[in-house]
Amino acid sequence: MGKLIIEGPARLNGAVKISGSKNAALPIIAASLICDRGVLLENVPDLMDVRTMIDILNSAGCKTRFAENVLSVNPPEKPNTDIPYELVRKMRASFNVLGPLAAKYGKASVSLPGGCSIGVRPVDYHIEGLQKLGFSINIEHGIVTAELGERPQEVLISLPFPSVGATEHIMTTAAILDGTHTILENAAMEPEIEDLANFLNDMGCKVFGAGTRRIEIFGVEKTRECTHRIIPDRIEAGTYAIAVAATMGDAVIENLQVSHLVALFDVLRSAGVEIQQIDETAIRIKMNQRPQPVKVQITPYPGYPTDLQPQIITFLSIATGTSTVSETVFKSRFQHVDELRRLGAKIEVNDGTAIIYGVENLSGAQVNATDLRAAAALVIAGLMASGTTSINEVDQIFRGYENIVEKLSRLSAVVEYFE
């Protein structure tokens, strides 16, 4: 695994352009499996996870071409519905090809997924949803096989928790079950859900209510060719916003959707960050003092996002008092805390809540990245810290941040990557 060397402290300034959303691109690329004609996707970020999902489509027999953030997908002439373990193990989102493949071709097999190790992230909701849609499910030797049986005319699925992955999986699968009317309650409301629904509708599907807790899907028989542009990555935008504030910098963040990050901006303002909205797609972040302590609760959208939890803890580690961050989505998502302590942070974790006792500054050290967003948090910490910070096993960061070394360098950071 690679290593990132950061010389700090930095003060980020300038401008950074946000890439297309990883969390929107992955389910949309997976949904391309149901296309009867070609689809063209624009603003697709060039990331390890995106490349893996494209490999999965190629394994299924699709014909793809990916260049300059544009992906074309054409349906297979001879489909393969048994997706190999070596692809699926790399990331959790790969499991979302099971339902679309089985709905399209009658039967499919996918290994249980891999991805970030950040606590319990069960696929039970996915499987229960597929069963209600008329699929028989068999799990043997780590492989899940779904086979389409008699299609129900009316289906009501109520998720116990508004899972993003389960919402996307069920929505995409139900979209091509011709003759089936599906109501999905307690659905996730994230912007990526809306983007997926817009893509499905661009293909001729009939999905209504995405972005609310109740989604209605009328299955269609055929889809049409379409062109769709992926929304900006709100997690990347939020990460850079926190990084600028944490380094007491002054920078403009471009090509984001400001309305997607209201919860983050509320927290940053409470901590004393100056945020100037230039327009709907650009903001200026400015900070010239240590942050004020705040209380943050991590909840499903439109609340504060779990994927920005490690970053905000890092920012608050130099606050002028004691802050708390309570995690309600992935309660064990605190592996980064031990690494932050190595840099001088004073943090306790108790029953899903991090208690952060602000210190005056951090100091560079060797640390290990435990997952994608933890890696991003450690990068921010390295930018904040005095001296040299060496982040080992940092390759995970390339799963979610396009050209991060180049972007940070353009913001005046001193960052170097070693394989």
Swiss-Prot record:
Pathway: Cell wall biogenesis; peptidoglycan biosynthesis. It is found in: Cytoplasm. GO terms for biological process: cell division; cell wall organization; peptidoglycan biosynthetic process; regulation of cell shape; UDP-N-acetylgalactosamine biosynthetic process. Pfam families: EPSP_synthase (PF00275). UDP-N-acetyl-alpha-D-glucosamine binds at residues 92, 307, 329. Keywords: Cell cycle, Cell division, Cell shape, Cell wall biogenesis/degradation, Cytoplasm, Peptidoglycan synthesis, Pyruvate, Transferase. This is UDP-N-acetylglucosamine 1-carboxyvinyltransferase.
